[in-house]
Amino acid sequence: MADQEITLMKGNEAIAHAAIRCGCDGYFGYPITPQSEVLETLAVEKPWETTGMVVLQAESEVSSINMVYGGACTGKRVMTSSSSPGISLMQEGLSYMAGAELPALIVDVMRGGPGLGTIQPSQADYFQACKGGGHGDYHLIVLAPASVQEMADFVDLSFELAFRYRNPAMILADGAIGQMMEKVVLPPFKPRRTEEEIIKECPWATTGRMGRKHPNIITSLELRSEEMEVINLRIQKKYKEIEEKEVRFEEYLLDDAEYAIVAFGSAARIAKKSIEIARSQGIKVGLLRPIILWPFPTKEVQKLAGKVKGILSLEINAGQMVEDIRLAVEGKVPVQHFGRLGGIIPDPDEVVDAIKRLF
């Protein structure tokens, strides 16, 4: 496909094509519905014959994330993708990568749980993604696409943020976004970085370069408590910087809104239709969509609390993001949650009824 060509594809396919085009060096993954098309598309496209990108199906999600760890140590642009149960298996590796300050991209195309659950869409991985699902005090940078176009656009953005802050980044997409087909313009081809460029950009990397006075050693282990605290404080300082600089969100019809919906991913798309219906009935509703879930747009939610009569957290789960909204609002206005479970996506009319009932 030529640059700027409009094509029709699934969200998962857009992830794969964007990875090839944005200079990704390696993908290590394992098939699981509803994200298997990422690996399948890479296998069909055979980027190892064109860009030199490595594509490998590992024997498990545990192996996949540890391969990503190894690739990230060398300063390469590496990634994996999975769905909810598979992401659970990766949590140890993600904690290790955050502790070692390694940049990489993880894609989670969420399905319903708990346990094996269902293959239908869900947003129930919010806590796991945004609060650090593994052990220790760490965060991933979490991006939440709401369209196939954003699935494509967020691949390069995720890598840029991951390398800027030396931190794993996650694209958190629900199964509906992964499986839906839409028009998309793929990013232009970006060549993979040369070894010299990697050495310049990533002086911390274990590139195998000879002649260093002090070889790079990457680890998250430190047995001296005082030194471990210093490391933690440095990482927390980095998180504060991310919180100050990387909050991204979309506002929709909030100028005159009396009620606000906060939603991400496919739930935000539903919210826009619900707002159209509500406004046709004389109920002034607007939308705040977090584009990046962590860091969360706390200040923007706080501003909402001074403008509206109530806030509805629309999620395809039992209520997770609503906790961050309530923390931000500090009891200044009522905050309610509405969502569906078991892989069922809320209907726009249901959302309007919830606004009428809850407020």
Provide a role label for each language-model segment:
Residues 10-14, 236-259, 272:
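Glycine-/acidic-rich phosphate or pyrophosphate-binding loops and their flanking alpha/beta elements
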Residues 315-359:
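Peripheral docking tails and interdomain loops at the edges
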